[in-house]
Amino acid sequence: MDIIQTIMDVLQYVAMTDTVRPPKGVREAAALGLRLRERQPPSNRAGTPVGLARARDLANGRPVSYATLKRMKAYFDRHEVDKQASGWRPGEEGYPSKGYQAWLLWGGDPGQRWVLSELRQAGLVDKDGVTL
């Protein structure tokens, strides 16, 4: 292994173990997701155990590791398409949909923007948002 690769590996390790705190908009979105979920009948409650834990951490402003930010990015990438479903916006039938609730639990649109910004600054995604 050459010295450059070793340095790159160390930098990536540091970036993955360092933590950042979610900004206000992310905390508010996660808290809203928890409130909306709580008001739903059990049959319309969204959120896996992982998503609920993430929401509680975000809503409470707990530090988030870069490894977790990468997992959050993967969630947002997979579920971006959910925004096209019915029940995403107030006034639509089925609002708030399970997809909308879950999106908020992960920090919502502010969370998506924050995650991408943090990962870009850490050099963990490229300029197009592709995870490195």
Task: Report residues per predicted region.
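Extended terminal accessory/targeting regions
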Residues: 3-132
